[in-house]
Design a protein with these regions (language model features):
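An exposed, glycine/acidic-rich loop-and-rim segment of catalytic or binding clefts
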Residues: 1-327
Length: 327
């Protein structure tokens, strides 16, 4: 397995990516001279399984209960990797695959993967492109895909943001705003129940800037509940239903000390907030060191009809974008 690093940059930002998992390895903000996301240090560290650090998750980001769904009259059994459930595409999801780099210009990188029929149990031969693109102090992550059969697809990038100048500091000094009046209720295994709940009068309300550290300390740290290696309810791991707006605004994250701010925009219907309570990698990464804002469709969507559909029609091209503005 040969892992290669590629770079695009302009006068504002330098973006580094890896071909394994079409991974976002670095977002270097030149004005502050700091990388804004976590990584594993060396690119060779990505050869082993990790906490999806910067990776593209697929074929289906998030969880699907009992690792199965039905299309038409046919039931599909998927390769479970979290108890009886499947998380982020299975045991060998897109994060573990070497993607082919098909384009590399000064401000754009395009990766491509061809996922065969029944890959991790999913139907259809699926072709996916992951595009990283720079424009001034903005950078884009775009996904394009099509299949030759009816199938379910949900892609996201799993970067851990940390806007501190020193990455040894946690995210408790970060303030977050999410453009969402609602979130998905989940069970103890973080599987959506199908109920969509209001954020009003709850700890899940981020409609105005709220301090991450204060929310976690008040609501989680005194009642830590760890169910498994990947299910730790001592922080946020929740899907928000983005309010529909013309400008596609999703969320804004800012740091009180560094004064750095990241605004997120996307045409996808949800965003997964994860505060890295389970994160651990050697002596480099630790819990609450990063914050994920994973723009995506809803977990468990193949089994809940009222959720925005993730069903892809044969030979139809699907395109989605997420934009990050660094200030």
């Amino acid at each position: 397995m040969k892992i290669n690093c590629s770079t695009i940059e302009n006068k504002y930002l330098r973006i580094k990516t890896l071909n394994i998992g079409a991974t976002l390895f670095e977002v270097f903000y030149k004005e502050k001279k700091v990388n804004l996301i976590l990584n594993l240090g060396s690119k060779d560290n990505y050869k082993s399984k990790n906490f999806y650090v910067g990776s593209t998750c697929g074929r289906f980001a998030g969880r699907i209960s009992k690792s199965k769904f039905i299309i038409g009259n046919k039931k599909y059994k998927l390769n479970n990797n979290e108890g009886n459930n499947i998380l982020h595409g299975g045991k060998k999801g897109f994060d573990r695959i070497i993607w082919k780099k098909i384009k590399h210009s000064k401000q754009k990188i395009v990766y491509k993967i061809e996922s065969p029929h029944k890959d991790q149990g999913f139907p259809g031969n699926l072709i996916v492109k992951c595009i990283y693109q720079l424009k001034n102090n903005n950078f884009f992550i775009k996904y394009e895909y099509f299949s030759d059969k009816l199938t379910h697809v949900n892609l996201t990038n799993h970067s851990y943001w940390n806007l501190n100048l020193n990455k040894k500091n946690d995210i408790f000094n970060h303030d977050l705003k999410i453009n969402a009046n609602q979130y998905l209720e989940v069970n103890n295994y973080l599987i959506p129940t199908g109920k969509i709940k209001s954020v009003s009068n709850s700890i899940n309300d981020f409609r105005k800037y709220s301090n991450i550290g204060k929310k976690i300390k008040l609501n989680f740290l005194k009642k830590v509940k760890k169910i498994s290696k990947t299910i730790n309810q001592s922080g946020f791991d929740l899907t928000y239903v983005i309010n529909k707006k013309i400008d596609y605004f999703v969320a804004s994250l800012k740091n009180r000390d560094s004064k750095i701010k990241v605004d997120v925009y996307s045409d996808l219907p949800g965003v997964q907030l994860y505060t890295s309570q389970s994160l651990k990698y050697k002596k480099k990464l630790f819990p609450y060191q990063g914050l994920c804002l994973e723009t995506q469709f809803f977990p468990e969507a193949p089994n809940i009809k009222k959720f925005p559909s993730t069903l892809t029609k044969p030979h139809k091209l699907y395109k989605y974008f997420t934009k990050f503005i660094i200030k």
